[in-house]
């Protein structure tokens, strides 16, 4: 892996990296986020008793949509033909909802940003739908857990 930043041109100005010479490979990225809240807020999400509707269903769709639109909101991301997006939720304890996003493609560049965007927007959607009853919710940490495929090789958080 190189320490050289590739998103700058010879004038030291931002540019989108040219991936035209890269090989097409299967690429998968997994990101995680979480949102912490009052126990009664999480209980109401679990029971489907939030006024705005089914929080997890809406957050799941928002996460999928966000992954598909990542290239439109992150300036140097390439538009990618995503082949799979999965958003999953887990009730970690009485105050924490974990969100995992898996994004797949077969292409010349990875889908790390799409996975990170997906879980971030899913968490923001949970916040939006529950803020009337709990303004003290905290989002994060958000992190890339793994990525496979591509020239830089595989990454799995916690492995050296």
UniProtKB/Swiss-Prot annotation:
Biological processes, Gene Ontology terms: Mo-molybdopterin cofactor biosynthetic process
Reaction(s) the record says it catalyses: (8S)-3',8-cyclo-7,8-dihydroguanosine 5'-triphosphate = cyclic pyranopterin phosphate + diphosphate
Positions that bind substrate: 76-78, 113-114
Pathway: Cofactor biosynthesis; molybdopterin biosynthesis
Entry GO MF terms: cyclic pyranopterin monophosphate synthase activity
UniProt keyword terms in alphabetical order: Lyase, Molybdenum cofactor biosynthesis
Protein name in UniProt: Cyclic pyranopterin monophosphate synthase
Gene3D superfamilies hit by this protein: Molybdopterin cofactor biosynthesis C (MoaC) domain
Keyword Isomerase on entry: no
Residue positions of the active site: 128
Highest rank taxon of the organism: Bacteria
Keyword Lyase in annotation: yes
EC number(s) per entry: 4.6.1.17
Signal sequence, renumbered to the chain: none
Species this chain originates from: Brevibacillus brevis (strain 47 / JCM 6285 / NBRC 100599)
Quaternary context: Homohexamer; trimer of dimers.
General function of this protein: Catalyzes the conversion of (8S)-3',8-cyclo-7,8-dihydroguanosine 5'-triphosphate to cyclic pyranopterin monophosphate (cPMP).
HAMAP family: MoaC_B (MF_01224_B)
Family: Belongs to the MoaC family.
């Amino acid at each position: 892996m190189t320490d050289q930043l590739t998103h700058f041109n010879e004038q030291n100005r931002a540019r989108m990296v040219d991936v035209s010479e890269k090989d097409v490979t299967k690429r998968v990225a997994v990101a995680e986020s979480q949102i912490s809240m009052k126990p009664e807020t999480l209980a109401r999400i679990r029971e489907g008793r939030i006024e705005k509707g089914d929080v997890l269903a809406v957050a799941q769709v928002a996460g999928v949509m966000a992954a598909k639109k990542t290239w439109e909101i992150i300036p140097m991301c390439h538009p990618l033909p995503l082949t799979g997006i999965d958003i999953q939720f887990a009730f970690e304890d009485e105050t924490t909802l974990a969100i995992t996003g898996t994004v797949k493609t077969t292409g010349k560049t990875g889908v790390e940003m799409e996975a990170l965007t997906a879980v971030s927007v899913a968490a923001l959607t949970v916040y939006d739908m529950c803020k009337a009853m709990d303004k003290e919710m905290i989002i994060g940490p958000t992190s890339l857990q793994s990525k496979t495929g591509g020239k830089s090789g595989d990454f799995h958080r916690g492995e050296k």
